[in-house]
């Protein structure tokens, strides 16, 4: 745990008592603050009370007595409208911050030179975060990995020399961290997402840019420039005097890092050199993972990791569950769990990675549906549609891709397996990449992916991929 000493002797309200909120309560208390915990959920309030914290309806507190409101990232700050606790804090002149801001203040007070790598982007954050952590760990660092990827940042060990914090950050967390100042900031890509919480793509991009704008003066900003939003951010931040490493998987760069025929190439000062060859690495299959690998490599290089280590340890990266995870094989058929593909942009990355696809898709639909994926329809031999989006997706696929409305994973998995095996096509893949949220049938995308894995591995003749 990281004790938060910057509010010692002061009273702080924490609203939103899930994992990161409760971790904030513990960290603030350990640092000497008095904590008042609030939540709209009675069960969360009860858990906080059982943990020994003062709980209250924050509508009844005297806001003038509070030094700060620490807001959980899941609570609306601006859109669709500010949460009532945010309005109350602002009316009283109380700052509204998040757990990453508390981390940044502690690091600035106690270990400002401790390496801190922050990663964001619409897609690929978790894989890149895990890959950076893997590379740094293999290079001999004491690595603390957390943030949006799972472990709350304040539940990690405190910053110190020789210890690197590798933190995945959502736009919500960035929005609550005005002092964000990573040693290395990585922005992978941007596409419309979470607009219910940001209003417009322009505001969403502005929030993401803050991670790059906050990079320390001697630090490095790594920016994927294959979309126009990020390309513009790279230009602006370079003009502002920051050291920017551009990354592309679509074209060679005159200066920066690119991926050419599975080779990560660095061009700097006119000199061209190969960093690593990622061909044949199953956990880094596909162009999207090439971008993840290139950005992670650029970040590791910025902290002094050698190229020899990069080549060796990119190959030993095991990958992440639910992100192009190979969960089983039966004869010529591969089963791939990409449950994290919760929007069309993410699913595009999966569809672009295979040629003979038996596609399981659907769930709680997102704006835009799957019309943007039509360039990949020729790769799809048949689609198996589940969840609320089934009828909408069927209308999009009509006349272009064979499909059946399976309704559930329990029906879709054996049907897709039967058809893939019967087709006799080399390179056949049963791919779960739903292009949808999971909340219509599952608690989250992890539960959905776990269920897919269970169903696949229960099929006769399937062997796990190791």
Curated annotation (Swiss-Prot):
ATP binds at residues 121-127. It catalyses: UDP-N-acetyl-alpha-D-muramoyl-L-alanine + D-glutamate + ATP = UDP-N-acetyl-alpha-D-muramoyl-L-alanyl-D-glutamate + ADP + phosphate + H(+). Pathway: Cell wall biogenesis; peptidoglycan biosynthesis. PANTHER family: UDP-N-ACETYLMURAMOYLALANINE--D-GLUTAMATE LIGASE. It is an enzyme of class 6 (ligase). Its EC number is 6.3.2.9. GO terms for biological process: cell division; cell wall organization; peptidoglycan biosynthetic process; regulation of cell shape. Keywords: ATP-binding, Cell cycle, Cell division, Cell shape, Cell wall biogenesis/degradation, Cytoplasm, Ligase, Nucleotide-binding, Peptidoglycan synthesis. Cell wall formation. Catalyzes the addition of glutamate to the nucleotide precursor UDP-N-acetylmuramoyl-L-alanine (UMA). Belongs to the MurCDEF family. This is UDP-N-acetylmuramoylalanine--D-glutamate ligase.
């Amino acid at each position: 745990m990281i004790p938060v000493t910057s509010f010692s002797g002061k009273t702080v309200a924490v609203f939103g008592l899930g994992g990161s909120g409760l971790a904030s309560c513990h960290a603030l208390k350990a640092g000497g603050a008095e904590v008042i915990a609030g939540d709209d959920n009675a069960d969360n309030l009860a858990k906080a009370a059982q943990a020994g914290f003062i709980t209250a309806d924050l509508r009844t507190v005297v806001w003038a007595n509070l030094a700060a409101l620490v807001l959980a990232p899941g609570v609306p700050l601006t859109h669709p409208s500010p949460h009532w606790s945010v309005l109350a804090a602002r009316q009283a002149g109380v700052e509204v911050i998040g757990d990453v801001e508390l981390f940044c203040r502690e690091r600035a007070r106690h270990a400002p030179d401790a390496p801190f790598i922050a990663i964001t982007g619409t897609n690929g954050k978790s894989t890149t975060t895990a890959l950076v952590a893997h590379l740094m760990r293999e290079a001999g660092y004491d690595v603390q990995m957390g943030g949006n990827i799972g472990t709350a940042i304040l539940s990690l060990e405190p910053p110190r020399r020789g210890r690197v914090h590798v933190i995945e950050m959502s736009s919500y967390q960035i929005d609550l961290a005005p002092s964000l100042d990573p040693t290395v900031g990585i922005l992978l890509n941007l596409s419309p997402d979470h607009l219910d919480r940001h209003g417009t793509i322009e505001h969403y991009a502005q929030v993401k840019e803050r991670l790059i704008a906050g990079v320390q003066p001697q630090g490095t900003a790594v920016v994927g420039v294959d979309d126009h939003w990020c390309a513009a951010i790279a230009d602006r931040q370079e003009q502002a005097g920051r050291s920017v490493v551009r990354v592309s998987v679509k074209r060679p760069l005159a200066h920066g890092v690119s991926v050419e025929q599975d080779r990560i190439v660095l061009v700097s000062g006119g000199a061209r050199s190969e960093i690593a060859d990622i061909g044949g690495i199953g956990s880094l299959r596909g162009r999207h993972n090439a971008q993840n690998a290139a950005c992670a490599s650029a970040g590791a290089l910025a902290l002094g990791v050698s190229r020899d280590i990069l080549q060796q340890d990119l190959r030993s990266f095991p990958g992440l569950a639910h992100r192009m995870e190979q969960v089983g094989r039966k004869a010529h058929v591969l089963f791939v769990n990409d449950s994290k593909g919760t929007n069309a942009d993410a699913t595009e990355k999966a569809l672009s990675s295979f040629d003979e696809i038996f596609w399981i898709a659907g769930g709680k639909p997102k704006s835009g549906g799957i019309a943007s994926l039509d360039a990949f329809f020729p790769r799809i031999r048949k689609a198996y549609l589940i969840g609320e989006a089934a009828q909408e997706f069927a209308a999009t696929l009509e006349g272009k891709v064979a499909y059946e409305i399976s309704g559930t994973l329990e029906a879709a998995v054996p049907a897709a397996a039967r058809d893939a095996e019967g087709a006799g096509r080399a390179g056949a893949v049963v791919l779960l990449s739903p292009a949808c949220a999971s909340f219509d049938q599952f608690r989250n995308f992890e539960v959905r992916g776990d269920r897919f894995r269970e169903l696949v591995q229960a099929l006769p003749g399937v062997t796990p991929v190791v």
